[in-house]
Amino acid sequence: MLPAPLRGAATLLAVLALAALLTTVRHNASAYLTGVWDTGSQTLVYGRIHQMEQGQHAPGGFLGVYTDDWSDDTNRALFRDDTPTDAAAFHPYTHQSGLQGWLFGRVNRLLRHWLPDGLARETALYWLNSTLFYAAELLVALAVWEEFGPLAAAFGFASVLLAPWLQRGMKDLYWCLWTWLLPLLATLWLCHCTCVRGKTPRGCWPLVAAACMVRCMCGFEFITTFLILCEIPLCYAAAKAYFVRRDPHGALVWLGRTVGAGVSALGGVTAALALWFAQEWLCFGSAADAWQNMTRAVTDRVSLTDGAVRDVNVPQVLAQYFRESTEPLLQFGPVSVTAWQLLLFALLVGAVSVVVCLRRCTAAQLVPPCIVWGLGLAAPASWMVLSKAHAAIHTHLVPMLWHFAFVPISCMLLPVLAKLMIPGRKKDLVASH
């Protein structure tokens, strides 16, 4: 039996190897074979990479472009063709810190030693981004396996492999979908350490804060989504302690950890805001101008103040996302599943589970999975409520948003609920901690 550190290192290496294999076999690094997602936003990263490649600098270190129209493909061409550019022509995009641009810019400069061709370096960056996303999803699947068993983990991970928009979008250099999962991974690690050691190590709290800070430095969009993702494992643990193990004190302890994780997450968000403000100050030269630009960026994205951006209300946005979008969330050959169809199916399965478990007097065991499912639905829906104009405009985000975390949770819980309904199985689904 290997020591725990060696087991952890071996597991991480195996996850990275499998993630790299999946990226290669499924051609996720190829813009030609699996397509691209949001070229309009990704061009901001290409501009920043090209700026670093040219050895140029601008105050603040933001993403940006060298063209007046930043929604076209010109900046990507500048990067791929190594076209010389004028430093004064760079237009910074100041609505976020742009950490992903700095990160990929550094990696790109390293890749130049082996890949002088711009197209080859672009493919390598896509490959890295997709591999990191698969690795994050595999780590989540391992946590699901530990708690619910291999079948639930397989169903959850299958939702990634069968999601056409994830397969296309995981390579995107702007959105960096693997960073959306960092807060969730941090709290999953917190729960794991707590269960193994009997108490929460102090280092877990700054880890949660750092995960949220990194995500926010790559963009504050969908902030409520990944903050709710961050709390799902802890809410599940609290519900399981109260309803399944009948341990009110244990439930209160887990609720305290939920609050602690929330405070840590908000601390990470605050740190990201402070760094963003410092960048704005460097860019605009004064605190007043920096504050004005920040508040304008925020008010354009908050439902209470975004009326000037687009005249739309929250029910309209919810209808657009739930009912009007016909984009498939899951695709298996000719069979596709939309958000509305998956929601109805999940509600039907849930209703049957409630009836069966009530008859078998095991309804209490349904509460924790139902809380997980409800939070999985609330995570994407919360952004539609918080930022209705942004959600209404960016229709290409509609099918992607559901995968954080409504789709994988709905798939994961199918075998969990089936296990609860099988006659003769009344013991706990997971080991108690």
Predicted regions and their residues:
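Transmembrane-helix motifs of polytopic, lipid-linked glycan transferases
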Residues: 124-152, 357
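Transmembrane alpha-helix segments characteristic
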Residues: 361-390
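Membrane-interface alpha helices of multi-pass inner-membrane proteins
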Residues: 203-222, 226, 264-265
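Membrane-lumen/periplasm interface segments of specific transmembrane helices
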Residues: 258-346
